[in-house]
Structure formats: structure tokens, C-alpha cells
Amino acid sequence: MSESIDFYDFERLLDKAYEELPENVKSHKSRFEVPPAVVTIAGNRTIIENFVDIAEAMNRDPSHLLKFILREVATAGTLEGRRVILQGRFTPYLIANKLKKYLKEYVICPVCGSPDTKIIKRDRFYFLKCEACGAETPIQHL
């Protein structure tokens, strides 16, 4: 091997990689946290008081998250203001599990584990595009 080859040192390569990252990934200093669901059962209805806050923390459209929850618990429901009213009695534990499932399937990148993703449509297919690593993973359309 020739001695004249100029190899990048680790620090310069690291700086170059950091410059290539999107701004929202660079500025992501805090840990990704989704607020726990505030669930109230009133009669034969279940109310998720902070539903829009949860959707915003996941960086998802509340209507997409609502559609997922309604399919998972097989019921009807409506978005009223910042809360959701579901027909039927559902435990806070069940709601939390459904939110975790949504996170796993529609938010967290399966390649690098980053929450910095968005849902994109290409032709008839939907993909989870990671803004941190650039991976595109096909997802099921709701």
C-alpha cells in the first residue's frame, strides 16, 4: 500500500457526517417522550383527554392516530377539540398498549430506532421515511 494516500481522520469524518444531518435531527437534544394518555371512563364512553398532545409528540396527524386506535379497538369515536371520545369502556392499560403499537409501526424507524420519521406516499404505497438515517420502510395503509 502506498504511503501517499491521505486518509481522513476520525474527527473530520465525524464532522462531515454531522453536517449532512437534517436540522431537526441535529437539534434533537432531548429524549423522545410521549405523554402518557389521560384516560377517563364516563358511563359507556372512554375519553382520552390529551389525544392531540400525544399525536403532536409523535409528530403525526391526530386523524391518522385516531383511525389506528379506532381500528385496533373496533369501535366508533370522534375527535372533539384536543380530546377523543370512544364508544365503549377501554382501560388505560389497553389504550397505552395501542399507542405503543402505533409508535412501533408508524413512528419509530425500524433501521436506526429514531423517532424522526414521516409518512410518505409513493404511487399507491406508503413508506415510513427516517430523517435521521434516510431509510424507507413500507408500512400498511390505514
Swiss-Prot record:
Keywords: Initiation factor, Protein biosynthesis. One of its GO terms (molecular function) is translation initiation factor activity. The keyword Protein transport does not apply. Signal peptide: none annotated. SMART domains: eIF2B_5 (SM00653). Transmembrane segments: none annotated. InterPro entries: IF2/IF5 (IPR045196), TIF2_bsu_arc (IPR004458), Transl_init_fac_IF2/IF5_dom (IPR002735), Transl_init_fac_IF2/IF5_N (IPR016189), Transl_init_fac_IF2/IF5_Zn-bd (IPR016190). It holds the Pfam family eIF-5_eIF-2B. The keyword rRNA-binding does not apply. Heterotrimer composed of an alpha, a beta and a gamma chain. Belongs to the eIF-2-beta/eIF-5 family. HAMAP family: eIF_2_beta (MF_00232). eIF-2 functions in the early steps of protein synthesis by forming a ternary complex with GTP and initiator tRNA. This is Translation initiation factor 2 subunit beta. The lineage of its organism: Archaea, Methanobacteriati, Methanobacteriota, Thermococci, Thermococcales.
